[in-house]
Design a protein with these regions (language model features):
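Ser/Thr- and Asn-enriched, surface-exposed coil loops between beta-strands
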Residues: 65-71, 94-96, 134-142
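Active-site proximal loops enriched in glycine and acidic residues that flank catalytic Cys/His/Asp
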Residues: 4-6, 90-93, 104, 115-117, ...
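Carbohydrate-binding surface patches
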Residues: 70-108, 153
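Aromatic/acidic polysaccharide-binding cleft in carbohydrate-active enzymes
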Residues: 1-58, 62-75
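Flexible loop/turn segments at secondary-structure boundaries
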Residues: 8-15, 95-98, 120-123
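Solvent-exposed beta-hairpin/edge-strand motifs
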Residues: 105-125
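Acidic Ser/Thr/Pro-rich low-complexity disordered segments
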Residues: 21, 118-135
């Protein structure tokens, strides 16, 4: 999977190079104020949050782990390990809260937990994702609720 359109300003319709005809579907638009008189277009857009976490914590060379979920429930899970460190990501694509029960291959020490919801995604001053909790000790089984239309990532990777 690749996210090609990071910055709207780098891609115009038909590759014309015309900055007034740029595609508005990237993670930000560095020309928001200059061309559109809208500085808010220069802010990092919400889809950057989950994408950046997945890129950071599922690095090249990771071993993807087998997961078992009932997709009809609207929950999807991915997990990986690299250098003895683990990551688990889960998404609830439904309009209802769901309960999530995880069985992990090993306990996670010093883990961080990230949650994303449209109206709640903790970030630092630059808009980069911040963990909701850190320094967690998670046993080989873990239960949590996953709100409707939300994303969860748990990792002990640095």
């Amino acid at each position: 999977i690749a996210a090609w359109m990071l910055d709207d300003a780098m891609h115009s319709n038909g590759d014309s190079g015309n900055t007034e005809d740029i595609k508005l579907w990237g993670m930000w638009n560095i020309l928001g104020e200059e061309l559109f008189n809208d500085p808010s277009q220069e802010e990092i857009r919400p889809w950057y949050y989950t994408w950046s976490l997945m890129c950071r914590y599922f690095p090249a060379g990771s071993t993807i782990l087998h997961t078992e979920m009932d997709a009809e429930e609207g929950l999807f899970v991915a997990a990986a390990v690299k250098d003895g460190r683990h990551v688990i990501a889960a998404v609830n694509v439904t309009d209802a809260d769901r309960e999530l029960s995880l069985r992990l291959p090993a306990p996670l020490e010093g883990a961080s937990l990230y949650r994303y919801q449209e109206e709640n995604r903790p970030t630092d001053d630059e808009g980069l994702p911040l963990p909701l909790e850190s320094g967690l000790s998670i046993a080989t089984s873990y239960k949590t609720s996953l709100p409707a239309r939300s994303f969860l990532l748990i990792t002990n990777m640095n």
